[in-house]
Amino acid sequence: GNVILFSDLNSQLAAFMVKHFNDRALKDQLRRLINEDIARHRSDQAYIGNHVKIVNTREVNNTIVHDDCEINGASRLSDCTILSTPAANVYIGTGVICENTIISEGSSITNSVKMQDCFVGEACHISNGFTASTSIFFANAYMSNGEACAAFCGPFTSSHHKSSLLIGGQFSFYNAGSATNFSNHAYKMGPMHYGILERGTKTASGAYILMPAHIGTFSVCFGKLMYHPNTRNLPFSYLVAYGDTMYLSPGRNITTVGLYRDIRKWPKRDVRMPGSHKSIVNFDWLSPFSVGEILQGKEILEKLREASGTDVASYTYH
């Protein structure tokens, strides 16, 4: 895969790996540095740290459990590393099955969650039968009921619904509506495609996006978006599918009260303890990155108006 899992992984390094691992020399150097770090911290055997509480748990196999962790009623923990600390302890609850997974400080995994080959970052909450495979979660991500496969869930990614599937995408500050779905099997070539939903994107109930796709910052997606939209330079938009046609309302989301509610709630919901801030979280919604997209979007819209005039019901943009 494109992301190497190790204890000190954060969202910035993971995103860097995903973006630049086509550079073979860079990939080799990163692998060397990470393997050196792993070698320094590798233990010859599994161990259980101080003040750990393990109750009614069926199987703990080849797992490193750090201090002040509580494991209560788990079904199986195999080949895992649990990075609990006295200030930010980890809780593993009833029915949980975790295999080959790293769980970071302050996280809780509860209520029959099933995870395989995953990384769980600091202060994440995963519960209520959520199923995850080959996925990574960072900094205050909240996952419940649904499933994730090959998903890059950055800080404050949120999915609450049983019928939601996050697959083959990179998300952050994202909220998945009920029955949200993605497909990374375009052209029947197998699961080789992926997409990016930039910071603050939301998908409405029943939304579907066919990858590859690139959705701009703080956009909202409605319906079945089938034609690989790339709206990176049109942030704060509504993307609405009617049949085979997708309509884009540029800047629509910047006028909604929900956007400003989200902007204010995220800093309050950062429950990471001091000393466990691995991922760098920038809460500013207007940054050089997002403002640059706004300026490019303004230029695109001005060119459309110049080409088609002002007396039209809609503009065609490819």
Q: Model-predicted segments: where are they?
A:
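Catalytic alpha/beta active-site cores
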Residues: 68-70, 79
